[in-house]
């Protein structure tokens, strides 16, 4: 089963402030471990929404809207795609990732990770 882990943006990432180097090193090591284990398919951080564009349809002509976009907590800051046997395994991988943030940034650091299964053609057959 494939899962996408979606890291929410925060005010610092939206301002283009790079993450703490200690956190990046720890996350890099965790990612390398997952790649070696064959569980991480892809990962990446996203540029601030000020560099992004949305294309919206409905209620009239198509609209192209340049960022920045409001509500940083609703924006995606990064992602990882994993191949794992179950949702429980995905939750455990997500917990390990988030635990690094608490260990390095401290207990007051706030962040959110959303885990969603990626559907393939087999999920749409009736």
Task: Explain the meaning of each model-derived region.
Residues 1-126:
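Conserved, structured core segments of small domains
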